[in-house]
């Protein structure tokens, strides 16, 4: 697209959209935010006023049918990602969609199919951002043989974890009707791991909802179908195996850390005082040492810049393309299937 002004409609103005996507898009030269549709006309009007967006729409479909709008940014909960993405692509609009990609892999494949049917349009999923400063360095270390062949991945994800909060309020992330097969932070960490060592070939999972029910706004007790503690075992496609433990209900738990163990070395990405750091060591070393990351390898958040550049034809989408996003949705589906059946699941599940 070579036009000077790219007009973007915002559909769903949640916290990340207001914090990241709206200001990020407004910072791009030649971009105009022309409309916003949130969950109600009142909230749409409020967001439009707060962020200087031209018009508040009554419904997201009003943005889809507006021929003056070139692209949409979708910041809704996952249950609407597929219907809005597909409708926008069919209407000839470029799409930037918040993560997680969809409710499940079937929806993800439908989104990918709609995008492939319209190769002139850009479709991008917001990437897992937490490892961006480290990704290129880890990729280079693995590719250059720093760990040799992959033996094992040990991932402990406890960000935000505490003893069970029995009186905590329901959240959309606990609601399978809104969140689908996405569970806690497992998807964003698997997406990061795929950048480093590729996808899994098999999945076996066990888990539970320790907080089994919560009270909704009316005081009614409702079940929590999404686990707050899971352990996932995988065989990796390139060899080696993975053990990932994710929880929000472990009191006094160690900080989040992910280690790649190889035949010749080890890489560890670990959280301390809320910040991630990178360490590595090789055969013969007595301990892991901090990795000095070259300035040119320090990645960061540039989602909106990448999207607009892709729309203008000056950059290809890498963070994240729909093919990659479908792979993490297939893995999430496999985790849920294994949780349900107690059996191992082979990937890919759909072709």
Regions found by a protein language model. Name each.
Residues 184-185, 190-275, 304-310, 314-315, ...:
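Contiguous beta-strand/loop segments that form the cofactor/metal-binding neighborhood of enzyme cores
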Residues 121, 129-222, 342:
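Predominantly a Rossmann-like dinucleotide-binding segment in NAD(P)-dependent oxidoreductases
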Residues 2, 71, 77-78, 82-130, ...:
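Beta-strand-loop-alpha-helix segment that lines the small-molecule cofactor/substrate pocket
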Residues 16, 39, 294-305, 320:
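Active-site loop of classical SDR/Rossmann-like NAD(P)-dependent oxidoreductases
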